Regions:
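Cytosolic beta-strand hydrophobic patch enriched in CBS
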Residues: 46-52
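Conserved acyl-donor/pantetheine-binding loop and adjacent beta-alpha core of acyl/acetyltransferases
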Residues: 55, 59-94
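Conserved acetyl-CoA-binding loop-helix of GNAT-fold acetyltransferases
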Residues: 103-117, 145
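Conserved active-site alpha-helix within GNAT-family acetyltransferase domains
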Residues: 119, 125-129, 133-153
Length: 167
């Protein structure tokens, strides 16, 4: 199936959450039990990756929410020129890919979709960074391979400057 068969849409009642399994129980449970509540409470928005021929089957998902980072937490080169103590951004709270889809490069596609989404938001809002809290060292390396930087050595919190990202 080609990449053109993939689409990202907001999570809705038509999506089959019960069939999704990424291999990490907390991420599976979030999608099934918490994502809709977070939307209703305006805490996060969940977006799902599906295939056009099977729009109900969730291939992967990510969540976005407003976030800010203390200026002194950013590396010096990333903080340069910012006159405020807090830097506006977006948090990828969760990013997960169904186990049946792993190993096909779709994780990178899903992350790229989230980054592009944030770049579109940046046109209308003041956003400087995209932040993620990796669940493991392996996940942190995945984000690093995709342009994210750690806040500090050994940290599982990473960021991507939205300054030069364009949709």
């Amino acid at each position: 199936m080609s990449a053109d068969d993939l689409q990202v849409t907001p999570l809705g009642p038509q999506h089959d959450r019960a069939a999704f399994s990424c291999g990490e129980a907390t991420l599976d449970r979030y999608l099934r039990e918490q994502a809709s509540q977070d939307r209703k409470r305006s805490l996060a928005r969940c977006y799902v990756l599906t295939r056009v021929p099977e729009p109900a089957r969730i291939v992967g998902y990510y969540t976005l929410s407003a976030h800010s980072v203390r200026l002194h937490d950013l590396p010096e080169d990333a903080a340069r020129g910012i006159p405020y103590r807090d830097v506006p951004g977006v948090l990828i709270g969760r990013l997960a890919l169904d186990t049946r889809e792993q190993g096909r490069g779709l994780g990178e596609r899903l992350l790229a979709a989230a980054v592009e989404h944030c770049a579109r938001l940046e046109r209308d809002l003041g956003l400087r960074v995209l932040v993620v809290d990796a669940l493991s060292e392996g996940a942190a390396r995945f984000y690093e391979r995709n342009g994210f930087r750690r806040f500090g050595t050994g940290e599982l919190r990473l960021f991507l400057s939205l300054r030069h990202v364009r949709p």
